[in-house]
Amino acid sequence: MKIFACDSTAKTASVALCEDNILLAEFTQNGGNTHSETLLPMTEVLLNSMKTDIDEIDIFAVSEGPGSFTGVRIGAATVKGFAHRKDKPCIGVSTLEALATNLAFGENKIIIPVMDARRGQFYTAKFAFKDGELIRLCDDMAQSFEDFLTEVRELGSKVYLCGDGYSAGRKLLGDEYSYETPEKLRYQSAYSVAQIAYKKYLDGDRTSAEELRPTYLRLPQAERDRLEKTKG
């Protein structure tokens, strides 16, 4: 079963092709042009390098958010377009869970993905990796820096951070409350998206292109501004 996965929810753009949960190829870009300019060309190069046609894909997986509003929309629209052509199933994956999956190996640990939500906030969630299993400890949320710091201190153990909010998170927590994470594990990986999607597919958790919905956690700035004007 071939799985195509993509993540464009932050600065990093990543696409991957898997056979079940085995990685065949992954391309990642951490800078340069916008995702609207790079995601489709990256996908074309990925598939061509593996001599695979888009119509051969069985499952389309996407990091559904939270993250950059524009990036989330681009990823969802790309996958919806591909899946709609041949009525293939779609699977949406939490960006934060995919980030945590990057660190789901080795010894038991607490993993906290942090993404820049602006306005003094992170998009974040907490996960435990215990006895070879990644366990979600709370829902995805938008959380102020102050509340984030308070909750991590209350955990009573040092944590591993990942995501584009890594530097800000480490600055808040310092070495007292957090470990250093290798740089290559801090960023989005479409392979992590595919791994989660494969498990969800086996559990019967899938949807159609029409039903796939991004996760924003809060309204885009333009929509918030519009509502404020309406109240006024």
Question: For each of these PLM feature ranges, what is it?
Answer:
Residues 1-64, 142, 187:
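N-terminal beta-alpha supersecondary unit
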Residues 30-38, 69-73, 77, 94, ...:
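Residues at secondary-structure transition points
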Residues 22, 89-187, 216, 221-222:
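Surface "functional belts" at beta-alpha junctions
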Residues 46-50, 85, 103, 190-201:
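Stable alpha-helical structural segments in soluble proteins, enriched in small hydrophobic residues
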Residues 62-95:
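DPxDG-like acidic metal-binding loop motif
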Residues 181-232:
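Acyltransferase
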